From Swiss-Prot:
Gene Ontology CC: cytoplasm; mitochondrion
Designated name of the protein: J domain-containing protein required for chloroplast accumulation response 1
Positions in coiled-coil regions: 532-562
Known tissue expression: Expressed in leaves and stems, but not in roots.
Bias (Basic and acidic residues) ranges: 250-259, 281-291, 337-357, 405-416, 441-456, 488-497
Source domain of life: Eukaryota
Region (Disordered): 1-56, 114-138, 156-176, 250-291, 308-526
Organism of this sequence: Arabidopsis thaliana
Key word Metal-binding present: no
Gene transcribed to yield this protein: JAC1
Ranges annotated as biased composition (Low complexity): 126-137
Record comment regarding domains: The J domain co-chaperone activity is required for chloroplast photorelocation movement.
Amino acid sequence: MQTLPSSETVLLGSNSAPPVLRSPGGDDVDIDFGDVFGGPPKRRSKVTSNEVTRHSFSESALRRRDVIVDVGDLLPQDEKPVFGEDTSSVRRRFTTDDFFDDIFRVNESSSLPGSRILSPAHKPESSSGTSSPSQFSLPAKATEIPTFNLAATRSLNKNKETVSSSPLSRTSSKADVVSTAKSYSDDCDDPPQVFVTGKGRQFHFSIYKWPNKGVPVVIWGSSRLSSMSKAEETTPVPLSDYRKTSVVEKLGKNEEGDGKSGLSGLKDVKKTSLKRPGVQTKEEKTETDLKSEQAFFGVSKAREANVKPLDSVESEQAFSGVSKAHEATTVKPLHSIFHEEDERQDEKIVSEREVRKGKSKAKNTRSFTEDSRTKKKSQGTKSSLDSSPIPDKSSFASSSAAPEVGKDGVKGKVSDFVKIFSKGASVGAGGESLGQSSRWRAKETPKTDIIHDGSNAKETVNIPDQQKKSTPDIPAMNRDQKPSQSTQKKDSDRESMNYKAPGDTVQEERQEPSTTHTTSEDIDEPFHVNFDVEDITQDENKMEEANKDAEEIKNIDAKIRKWSSGKSGNIRSLLSTLQYILWSGSGWKPVPLMDMIEGNAVRKSYQRALLILHPDKLQQKGASANQKYMAEKVFELLQEAWDHFNTLGPV
């Protein structure tokens, strides 16, 4: 046994035994690590105290010296067999030189990588079979673990018993772990160098990557700063943030008095930013924008306050361009929307007018428009649109503003609309234009004779009647304040009807009386159809019977009043004279007044009268309605008298 000072590091060769660190009291180890995979640990009988030697992070373990101990000292002598083994004859051992070869050099995946990750050396065949616990009780400073001499020869013969022979133990999770490792490729024969430090939180290791493909084990030296810098390199920076940072850096350089120009300074910023893979493509795309900004800063050398107007100018230009494009595109759809709404409203109004107006009125309007148009053609006068003021200014406000828009071809439609609706109001006698005062002028000149130059004879036109029809039409349409296509179509149809031959008008005049005659017949038809012929004799008989019943009821009421007069409330007198009021065959036997002196006799007579006058009894006997009515009235009188008799008490 050899003891080394704590300042020295322990360097073990590939053929030496694995390093085992324990306290000087080696016989007092209280855990049998040879039985890690066989069940719960077994305590030795020689354990005296639960020292802290089993934990590698205790302060005492860090202070005491590192000791190289023989593996055989830790082997239990009275170990029980695990899974039926005999520990005396069968020993667990490192069988071949390439025991750890499958972890560090072989391409195929290792069987249990977790149990062989920190295997320290190739253990040659020895008498001590079981592996010792690897308690890495290392000092706080880094200690170099022996380099592994890996043989070039490989063997596929693996002992299945060595699966549980890993130097890892239950306490290895608390030990110091590998922090950095030198990567090597498959072609290189140099073994990897593994270093151990006391910072377990920096451990990053994967045996599936670096033994085969030569990928270096990424283990950062300084925990948070290095990780933040690494993550910052991989994360892409937005383009707007990059512009802001580059502008601020350039302004700082200009203020400090750097001799560099704006162009060169921003090129340096771009070079440094090209290291980031996420930003590279975005910066290449916006190279022209950066050059424009560079030229601006190179000329003005302004500060951060002067940079902001550039962004605002760009935003204003962009906004103005968008607003212009919006104006150019939205003029037509907005106007079309108004047209659609007006078309709907005008269709409703026109349909109502057509229903209200008769065919004779439509005939008069057609004749008047035809006469006015022929008069215009003969005299060659100007249109009413050019010479006359608009009848209602508020109605045609939109139409006057519409020609300014004129790009969409609305000007012609509006002018046609105004022409159509201003004919009746603006054209007066002799083709003169009339304004809003045309109504009053029409009153002053009630009638005018219009002489045609054609073959037609003179025709007298009643202008007040026509203007009464035409002038109300214009304000009705003024409410809409928008031209419509439906009204134009209908007016064009009217104009086409005006140009028909005179023979056609005569035929229409002949047809009108026939239509009026047919409508009158249609009105008369339902009058005859809706009536049914019924026999009224039965109803007359019923009425006669009802009248007879009413007379009989009156007679009964008079008879009852006469009988009850002076006897109301006197039960004895009513019962003694009951045979005078009841009909014959009622079943009432007269009772003399002398027999009803006592109270019991009165009670018996009253009960007999109730049996005769009760409605159920009358129903059984088949009494008539008049008899039932009489019995009801008599019963009411007897009931009142009986109540009065009970209040008086016995006599």
